[in-house]
Amino acid sequence: LVATDSIPAGKRDNAPLREQEKAINRDLNDMITPDGAGLTVLDLVKKYIATKTGVKHTTRAGYGTVINLLDKDPFGARRIDKIRLSDAKEWLIRLQQVDKKSYSAIHSIRGVVRPAFQMAVDDDILRKNPFEFQLATVVVNDAVTREAITRKQERTFLDFIKNDTHYSKYYDGMYILFKTGMRISEFTGLTVKDLDMENRTINIDHQLQKTGTLVYIDTTKTYVGTRVIPMQDDVYECFQHILKNRRPPKVEPMIDGYSGFLCFDKDGKPMVAMHWEKYFQHAVDKYNSIYRVQLPKITPHGRVIIRTS
């Protein structure tokens, strides 16, 4: 049969045998491994992840999320040489429209799957990477715009915190986050030894992270993130208050060799980013329940305090 021939009754509409032979010979001549080396999408992603050693805990957790998704999704069981550009696009569209995954989640998933397929191309297992396209042309970017809050909003919020009977106990920490530009995980990772009160400097060379139930110490997000920053007078006073009011448990908790953390929760465990995110959220909610002029949602994120409204 050739492409123009009609398909006999009871036969499958496969590529004509001559075309299949040409494709096989072409792959052999180009040293492309036949049948995608028998790898499924899940197999390929696992193989790719196995090459990524020395990554951070958060990155490793993200890999696990993608593996779990592909393990349950029929797309993960498909053979990689059968995935076309349109298949890749349709899958991502389904993740958003049917599975209701956010743009940022899909961006992270593709951030693992695309380099996995590129590895197969580089290894001469595939001829093309079906995920080599602009994501924004396929799925809708529903990510919330993030921008720093205004100086006026900052002053309004901090004044409210300082004078509130409940949230005033978090004022020093919130003030430090606003004024130093520290990441929230860098602040929660600070220990007494990181504060040089005599020379008024803050040593930042690690961060306290939580992934699921695992609380651990990690390096700073980037190499330049390791730094020593000066304390201005107002920040110095806030750290003085924190040290004076610090109430550690009888046995100082130790995490990956670090102890002497500055802030503790009601169970005597070092506070993590999640605690402070909740304090910010609840404080804004309380403010907005009292005053007519509303504050936006305020989140300690990265090195700036952002609004997400």
Predicted regions and their residues:
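N-terminal core-binding DNA-recognition domain of tyrosine site-specific recombinases/integrases
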Residues: 12-13, 37, 46-125, 165-166, ...
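Short, surface-exposed polybasic/aromatic micro-patch for ligand or macromolecular engagement
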Residues: 1-35, 222
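Conserved hydrophobic/aromatic pocket- or pore-lining residues that grip, position, or stack substrates
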Residues: 45, 88, 113-116, 124, ...
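Conserved tyrosine-mediated DNA breakage-rejoining catalytic core shared by Y-recombinases
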Residues: 136, 189-247, 253-254
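Basic, Lys/Arg- and aromatic-enriched nucleic-acid-binding interface segment
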Residues: 107-111, 126-128, 132-190, 198, ...
